[in-house]
Amino acid sequence: MSPIQAFGPQAENQSPPFSGHNAYRADPLLKDIAADMPRALRDDFETVGKFVASAEAQDLARIANRAVPELKTHDGYGNRIDQVDFHPSWHALMRRSVSSGLQGSVWEGRREEKGFAHQARALRFFLTAGLECGHLCPLTMTNASIAAIMASPRIEKAWAPQVVSRRYDSSNRPAMQKSGVTIGMGM
């Protein structure tokens, strides 16, 4: 015990931090579901499982849930902007989840996911939900929006590449000027 700890109250009934493992490897059901999937997908699940159980990811999730989004109605010059600013930890989680395809991998048509696209997304989603659920809401809405977008070939041509893009773009620009878009959270 360090000299500093000797003077403060000691918490004896707390579990140690739950990080540093692999959430995918630790779940026999997930491994069983993925057993017949291509090796590339199983490797991806390993990567997601390691990240979501890392201390870094858990810190991002904790901070993202404590740092409330802030509405900025005007810029410094009095111009109306109606912009919502999220903490960088929120953007880090979004960036990671978008790069994993949670916003639209089922619509990409990737060869390694052929026949497994929905199951692969569900497995990644399940693992990520164990970390933080709030950022999954806009990703779920984005994934669901593609079916409606596909109802119009003209709209699909314009929007689908932006929506299924695995590049998260948090900039406050028109959608067609962004490298990727999410659809949702316009409440």
Please state what every model-predicted region is:
Residues 91-187:
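Glycine-rich flavin
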Residues 1-114:
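Extended, charge-enriched "interface" segments that sit outside catalytic cores
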